[in-house]
Amino acid sequence: MEITLSISSSSVIPTRLPNSSCYSNLSFLSSNSNTSSLLLKKARIKTRTTKGFTCNAFFGLGVPELVVIAGVAALVFGPKKLPEVGRSIGQTVKSFQQAAKEFETELKKEPNPTEEISVASEQEKQEIKVSSTKDNV
């Protein structure tokens, strides 16, 4: 796809043109001394295809890294103690998640409107008492 655009010498040529999703490289060719002729050629970029299975779901670690970590843990703790260690780590993570949820709900929780109403009603009662004592004097 080729587009020819003529621009007078006094106008400004944009330094960057918007890219579309499938065409992103633009080639600029200029010619003619009186009028700048801009020829835009859009080049199609080849997308890379990744081979193999990649999973970056656990702290940005891939499958091979997780396998190595599991193997080292099995060697360090042994097959008998490994389930106990896994359970304790799971319980710790669960308690941290529960604490985070509780903290989040406390932050999101609005103050009770009944407390505000009771404070306002007490102030009104005090104002009424003050105005009634002024009337009596």
Curated annotation (Swiss-Prot):
One Pfam family named in its UniProt record? TatA_B_E
Q: Which UniProt keywords apply?
A: Chloroplast, Membrane, Plastid, Protein transport, Thylakoid, Transit peptide, Translocation, Transmembrane, Transmembrane helix, Transport
Task: Using the UniProt entry, state which stretch of residues is the transit peptide.
Answer: 1-54
Q: Which domain of life is it from?
A: Eukaryota
Q: Does the keyword Transmembrane apply?
A: yes
Enumerate the InterPro entries for this protein: TatA/B/E, TatA/E
Mostly located where?
plastid
Q: According to the UniProt topology, which residue ranges lie Lumenal?
A: 55-56
The record, for Gene3D superfamilies, names:
1.20.5.3310
Provide the Gene Ontology terms for cellular component: chloroplast thylakoid membrane; TAT protein transport complex; thylakoid membrane
Question: How is it placed in the membrane, per its record?
Answer: Single-pass membrane protein
What family name appears in the similarity comment?
Answer: Belongs to the TatA/E family.
Q: What interactions and quaternary structure are annotated?
A: In thylakoid membranes, TATC and TATB form a large receptor complex, containing about eight TATC-TATB pairs, which binds the precursor protein. Twin arginine signal peptide promotes pH-triggered docking of TATA oligomers to TATC-TATB receptor complex, inducing a conformational switch of TATA that results in activation of the translocase. TATA dissociates from TATC-TATB upon completion of translocation.
Question: What job does this protein perform?
Answer: Part of the twin-arginine translocation (Tat) system that transports large folded proteins containing a characteristic twin-arginine motif in their signal peptide across the thylakoid membrane. Involved in delta pH-dependent protein transport required for chloroplast development, especially thylakoid membrane formation. TATC and TATB mediate precursor recognition, whereas TATA facilitates translocation.
Protein name according to UniProt: Sec-independent protein translocase protein TATA, chloroplastic
